[in-house]
């Protein structure tokens, strides 16, 4: 069924404006039949952040910003779904056009600007689907016009703790002016201290909801040293590596679109984000698991991310070019690799290549 859907939908959606195509895809998923997915190979099961994942392949934040279709995505075979980014108040985001396909590069540039319907609407949707279970994380951010951005994160932690499987503290989007400044050492330490304190305040009523930190791939290694040190000292439960990049490789072929302002994702981000996964893994020293994201478009790419240090992986941009059937393809490739190498679980290879990757020349 998924293959047939991709065969029909991908060519049609490619003719539409990228944002209109995305909106149509969300509407289509809301109509997806309630068919249970095929059971995952038991070897793909992963335990991380105190949660049990049936497989390691998740969909990254940005696809289902407003929690409109998390259950359809789970039925398509994702091991987990991350909704958002959600802000306390609704906001329209940046003016259109703000989403661009770089088709020859299998990449996307976006400058969306945290457009979302706000915490109240997303909370209502998550409450309505809570009975169905599944791992649904909530990616949280600050409103562009907020007078106290840290207070925005705290409010969202307190609001969503009863319903979120985990939180992602997003301080790495390049499309909200000044947001990435929260990755600087003093600001990040204050933010994480207040976020973890908020989580502890609601623990009795909401449980121990894991808190993850999502970082940019454009950090220097010195900045990464500080970020990982603070994340460890504040006892975050994990990190997501990495968000979109502001850099533009000279190898990009879409020479006009490559100059659009915004964050670049997709295949050109793969080498940089994988290097950052490995660098983070080495610095974390097993203190917490990582989710690797950036340019994953095949089972081989997912395996490379895992061997670099990712316990779980996420994808989004590749769906634009490969379709929803990519999820099952990646899982099949991972299961086949475990069978071929006589391994019982992916945990046996997490970070196996990190020392080698961190010794390589920096990717351009």
Swiss-Prot record:
What single Pfam family name could you report for this chain, choosing any that match?
DHO_dh
Q: Does the keyword Transmembrane helix apply?
A: no
Superkingdom of this entry's organism? Bacteria
Q: Which organism is it from?
A: Rhodopseudomonas palustris (strain ATCC BAA-98 / CGA009)
Query: In the UniProt record, what gene is named as encoding this protein?
Result: pyrD
Q: What is the lineage of its organism?
A: Bacteria, Pseudomonadati, Pseudomonadota, Alphaproteobacteria, Hyphomicrobiales
Cited NCBIfam families: PRK05286.1-2 (NF003645), PRK05286.2-5 (NF003652), pyrD_sub2 (TIGR01036)
Q: Which cofactor does it need?
A: FMN
Q: What topology does the record note for this protein and the membrane? A: Peripheral membrane protein
Entry protein name: Dihydroorotate dehydrogenase (quinone)
Pathway assigned to this chain's UniProt record: Pyrimidine metabolism; UMP biosynthesis via de novo pathway; orotate from (S)-dihydroorotate (quinone route): step 1/1
């Amino acid at each position: 069924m998924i293959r047939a859907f991709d065969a029909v939908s991908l060519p049609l959606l490619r003719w539409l404006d990228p944002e209109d195509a995305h909106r149509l895809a969300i509407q289509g998923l809301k109509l997806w039949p309630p068919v249970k997915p095929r059971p995952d190979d038991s070897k793909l099961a992963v335990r991380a952040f105190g949660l049990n994942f049936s497989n390691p392949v998740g969909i990254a934040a940005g696809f289902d910003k407003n929690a409109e279709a998390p259950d359809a995505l789970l039925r398509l075979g994702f091991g987990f779904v991350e909704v958002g980014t959600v802000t306390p108040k609704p906001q329209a985001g940046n003016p259109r056009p703000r989403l661009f396909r770089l088709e020859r590069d299998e990449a996307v540039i976006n400058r969306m600007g945290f457009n979302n319907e706000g915490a109240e609407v997303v909370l209502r949707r998550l409450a309505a689907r809570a009975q169905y279970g599944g791992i649904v994380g909530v990616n949280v951010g600050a409103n562009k016009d907020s007078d106290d951005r840290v207070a925005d994160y705290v409010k969202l932690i307190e609001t969503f703790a009863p319903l979120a499987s985990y939180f992602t503290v997003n301080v790495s989007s390049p499309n909200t002016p000044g947001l990435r400044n929260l990755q600087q050492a003093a600001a990040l330490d204050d933010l994480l201290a207040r976020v973890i304190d908020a989580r502890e305040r609601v623990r009795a009523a909401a449980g121990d909801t894991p808190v993850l930190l999502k970082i940019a791939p454009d950090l220097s290694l010195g900045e990464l040293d500080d970020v990982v040190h603070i994340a460890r000292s504040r006892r975050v439960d994990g990190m997501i590596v990495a968000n979109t990049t502001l850099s533009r490789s000279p190898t990009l072929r879409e020479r006009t679109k490559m100059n659009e302002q915004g964050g670049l994702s997709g295949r050109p981000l793969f080498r940089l984000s994988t290097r950052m996964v490995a660098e983070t893994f080495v610095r974390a020293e097993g203190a917490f698991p990582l989710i690797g994201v950036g340019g994953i478009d095949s089972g081989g790419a997912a395996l490379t991310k895992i061997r670099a240090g990712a316990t779980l992986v996420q994808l989004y941009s590749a769906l634009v070019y490969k379709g929803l059937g990519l999820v099952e393809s990646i899982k099949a490739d991972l299961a086949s690799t475990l069978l071929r190498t006589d391994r019982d679980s992916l945990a046996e290879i997490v970070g196996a290549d990190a020392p080698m990757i961190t010794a390589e020349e920096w990717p351009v």
